[in-house]
Amino acid sequence: MFTLSLLSRGHGKLVQNKQKLEVYFEPEDYLNWKSPEDYILVRKPQDEGNADQHTWSLFLPKTFSTRKGALILYSEGLAISAWTPEERRKGPYRPKGRRKRPDLELHTLQDLKEAILAYGRRQREQDRAWQPYLHFRSQPESQGLRQIQPGYSAKRYLRGLLRTWPPGTINKLQCAGYIKDSVLLQDSQLNVPKNLRPQQDLSGVPLKYHLLPVFPPFWIQQGKSFGQGQQDLDEGEAGAGGQVDQGSVVKDRGIQGTCLPPLKKQPWQKDETQTEDTSKDNHHCIHTSKENHQEKAQQTSRRTLGHALFDHSWLLHDKSHTTFYYGGTFPNRKADLSDKQGTMKLHQGRSSHLFKEPPAERCLFPPVASAAGSEKNMPGDMKKKKAPKALKLPLISEEPPRVLDPLRSQLKASEPPAELFIFPVEIHYHSQHPPKGKAQRRGAPQPESAPETEEYTSSWRPPLKQVSLRGSRALRVHLPMDTDRDTLSPQEDVAPPQKGTSSPSLRKGKKSPESQRGPDSPRTSGRSSPTGPPCERPAGGALPAAGQAYESVSSNAGHGEEESSIQHLLKVNTESRTDLHMNLNETSPLTQKPENQGAQQSLEAAAQKTGEPQSCINKGLICSNRKEFYTRKLHLDMTPFLKASREEMDDHEEGGELRENHPDAQDPVRRNMTLDPLCASLAKHMQTPEADTVQKASKDYNVHHRHRGLSGHGPDSPEGLDPIDTSFLPRGKEGKTEPRLFNQKTSNNISNEMELIEKAKSRKRAKTDKSKAPKREKEGKLHEEAEAAVGKSKESKAEKKSQLISKGKKTGAKGKRTRKEGNLETAAELSGPDGINSKETKDRSGGGFFRSGSGVEDPWVSSKVEAPESQVSIDGRSSPTQTAAVPGNMEPEEDRSHEDPSKAFLVKREQEKASRDRLRAERAEMRRLEVERKRREQEEQRRLQQEQLERAERMKEELELEQQRRVEEIRLRKQRLEEERQWQEEEERRQWLQLQMAQERARQQQEEFRRKCQELQRKKQQEEAERAEAEKQRLKELEMQLAEEQKHLMEMAEEERLEYQRRKQEAEEKTRWEAEDRRQKEKEAARLAQEEAMKQAQDQARQKDALKKHLHFHQELHKEASGLQWTHNISRPWVYSYFHFLQIPRP
C-alpha cells in the first residue's frame, strides 16, 4: 500500500492565522487515484488438467469521499492471502495440525515475484507508462513449463557454511564424530585465517566444474552419458563413506551409454574371506586345472561387466585419446581400502583435482613392491631366468594400507600428486590371469564358466559401420616389462609372478607385420593380469589402455578383483597382437636390440602357438606439435632407463622406411577402423592345454611377447589363427600346460614366412631409399602418426619373430624378414583406399582372410557374424583410438607366399600413389580452408580496424566540436561579463552625475534662498528707516504745529481758545475711533480667514481618508481575487464526482 498521508491518518494543518482548519494535501493523496484497478487472486485454470495456475481479477477498493474528490484508503486485494475463493468459503475454522496448504505454492524466486507483483500483471500496455507499479516483462503463460536450473549441491552450501565456523568448533564436531565426511572438511582450511580463505559467491549461477587439462576430449564432449551415473560431480564428494552398489551403478549409467548386464550382488565379506584363505596357497597353485582358470576368467568378466560402461559416441570420436595417470589416481573415482580386509570401495569423486599423495588405498592400480620383496615371492626358476634387457621404470614407494585421513586429505587435496606421470596414450597389453590366490586376494569371486564369457564377449561389439567411421591415428610405444617387478606384495594387491612370465624388450622404429594390418583388423585393448605389470604397476614400466584407463574410472576398476577382471578383459582385446610399442622415430631411440635373436625367435614361435597378447599403447589423433610434446615427455621420463636401447635404432630404421610409405598409413580413416571377428568364436580354444610350451619359452625369453600376426601360423594350425583367445589363459599357469607341438609347427611356418618377407624387403628397401627418403623427412611426423595404427603391429611381430628365432637360427631371421615383407605387401593390397566401406570390411573379414580354406576357416567365418557386437573389450575399456587394421595378416600364409611379388609391388605402388594423392588433396583442401580462414580473419581485422579508425575520427570530430563549443561558451560568457561590467560602470557614473547635479541644485537653491532673505531684510530695514524718518517728521511737524497753535492761542481770545480746544478733542476722538474700528475689522478678517482655513483643512483630511479607504479596498479586492484564482487552479481536478474515477476501465 501507499504511504498514508496526514489526511488519511486523521490529521489536519492550520492555515494562516484565522484559526480555521484547512485540509493540507500531500503528494501521496494525489497518487491514490491513479490506480484505476486492483487485483485479487482468483482460481482460473490456464489449461486442462492443471488447476494450480491462477489469474488476477479486478476488485473495487475502499474509498473515502472528501469535498474535493475521493481518496483511496486501502485495498482488500493487498490483504487477501493466497487461498482460493472456494477454499475460503469452506469455513473459518480449520485445525492447526491438519490445515490444508494453499494451492498456490511458491517453488522459485520467480513464483515469489509473481505473488508480490501480481496486481500489476494484467495492466494494459498503454497504461504502463504512468503506472507506479512494477510489471512483468514476459507473460506468465510462457513461463508455466519453464525449466528451473538447479544451483550448487547441498555439500557445496554445507562447505560454505563450515567456512564461517571457527576452527575449534569444527575440530570438536569432527572429534565427537558428528562430521565424518572428509570431503566436507576438504576445503574448510582450518589452519588458514578467515580473511585469507577463498570465498565463493553461492548466490550466483554455478560455474562449470573444472576438469584437468589432461582429460581426453571424449570425456568432456561426450560426458553426458559418462556423467549420467554421477548425477552431480559435486554431490559425489559426499560419497567417501558409502559403498556404491554394483547393480545401481549399472542402472544409473545405462541411461545413455551402452550398459553391460548387471551383476549378481555378492558381499565383499565373502570375497575377503576367500582372499585370506586362498592367499596361503598362492605359491603352490602354479599348476592349476584348466577348468579353474576358465571359471575364474568367467567370474572376473561377470564382475567386470557389472561396472563397465561405454558409449558408441566415444567409439566414433575422431580425436579421442586416453590419458593415463602414472603413479596417481583417476580424478573421477576415489577408492578407500580398509585396514585389514583390503575391501575396495568405489566412490564417485570430484573431477576438478587429484589427491596429492595417492596411497595404496586410493590408487586405482596398486603401487609396486620393492624389487627385493618381489624376488622373495618369486619361484627360483624365475629368479634365474629373467630377461637380460628389460626396461625398468622407477618404483613407487610402498605404503601400508591405512584408513583415509580426512584432515590430511583436506589439507593436501589442492596439491597435485607427487608422482603424477601422464601418458596421453592408448594401451594394449597382456591379458594374463593371476593365480587363484591372487584373484581372491583382491576380492574377486570364484569363477563360473567360460561359455558365458563368450556370450558377453560377442554381445558387446559395436556395429561394424560405427567402428569403421572412427578416424583417429595411433602412436605406439614398446615398453618392456620386468618380471622381477611383476610381483606385488599382498598389501598392494599384488601376487608373486608365475613361471613363464618375462618382460618384452622396448622397441622403436621398426614396425612388425601386424602393424600393416588393414582397416578391418581388430585392435582393442584390455588390462593385463597381475603378472602383466602395465596394470598393477603404473611405475613398473607399463601403461593401461586408453579405453581401459577411461573405463577404469567409470567402472569398478578400483575394486579388489582388479587383476582377475583384467585377465578377462583382455580375452577380447588380444586381437591387437602387438607388443607395448610406440612410434618414436623422430624423438628418441627407445629401441633395444636383443642380445640373442634366436631365443626371441623360439619364444615367438611359442607365443604364436599360445596366442599370447602383447600390450600396445595407441596414442590418439593429435597434431604434430602435440605429438612431439607427449613423445618428448615420454622420452625424457624414460631416458634414464633406456640407455642401452639406443643401439637398436639402426636395426629398426630399415622397417621404418617401408612403414613411412605404406598406403594404409596415408588413410586416416582406415587407420582407425576396428574389426574383431576373431574373438567370439575362438574363445573355446582357451580350454586347450597349451601352457607347457609357453612355460618352456618363458625360460628362454619373455612370455609377455605376443606373436605379431597370423603370418607365422600355418593353415592347419588352429592356434596360429587363434592368437587372441589364448589370452584368456593365465600366463603364469599356462606356462607349464602348453603343449610343445605347436611350437615346432609354428617355428617351421615362421622360417618360411621370414624368407619371403626378407626378399620382398630387400627389393623395397632399395627403391624406397631412393624415392621415399626426402618425402619421409618432410612427412615423417604425419606418416609416423598415420601408420601407427596400420603397419606397426605387423612389423613388430615379424621383428620379434626374427629376434626369437635368431637365437638358434641366424638364417631363420632372414627368412622371417622376407616373409614379413610379404605380409606387408599383402596387407597393403587388402587394406586399400576403399577399406573404409563397412560392407567391404565385412567381405574381407569373411572371405579375404581365409582363402586357403583351412580346417580352422569355419570358426573364423562363424565369428565374423558376431564381429560387430564383440568389437570392443568386454569391460568396455577399449578407447575409440584403439583401432588397427589386420586383414592382411589374417590371410593364410600359403596364399601370400605364392603371390607374384611384382604384382604386389605394383598394386602397392598404385595404392601408395592413390593414398598420397588423396592425402595431397586433403592437405590442399586444408591449406585452402586455412587460407580462406586467414583471409576472412584479415578482412574482419581490416574491417574492425576501419571501424576503429572511423570511430576514432568521429570521436575526434566530436571532441573538436565540443572543444569549440566550450571555447565559444567561454567567449560568450566573458563577453557577457564584460558587458555587465561596462553597464555597471555606466550606471555608477550616471548615478554619480545625478548625485552631483542634485547637490549643485541644492546649493543653488540655498544661495537663492539666502539672497532673498537678505533682500527682504534690507527692505524691511529700509521701511523701518523710512517709517522712523516719517515719524520723526510727523513729530517735528506736530511740535511746530503745537508751537504755532500755542502762539495762536495766546493771540486769541478766551472764547476762541475754548472753541478751538473742543474741536481739537473731537478730531482726536474721531481718529481714535477710526483706528479702533479698523483694528476690529482686521481682527474679524483674520478670524474669518482662520475659520476658512480650518474648514478647508478638514475637508482635505476627509477626502484623504476616503481615498485611503478606497485604495485599501481595491488592494484587498485584488489580493482576494488573485488568491481565489490560485485556489481554484489547485482544486480544479477535484470538481468532478469521485464516481467518475471509480468507473470500471474498458478492457
Swiss-Prot record:
Highest taxon listed in the record's lineage: Eukaryota
Composition skew (Basic and acidic residues), residue ranges: 268-296, 768-802, 895-945
Biased composition annotated in UniProt, kind: Basic residues: 431-441, 807-819
Keyword list, A-Z: Coiled coil
Bias type Polar residues, positions: 584-603, 743-752, 870-884
Biased composition (Low complexity): 538-549
Region of interest (Disordered), ranges: 226-245, 255-297, 431-617, 647-670, 705-945, 1003-1032, 1060-1090
Coiled coil: 743-804, 907-1112
Name used for this protein in its record: Uncharacterized protein KIAA2012 homolog
Record gene name: KIAA2012
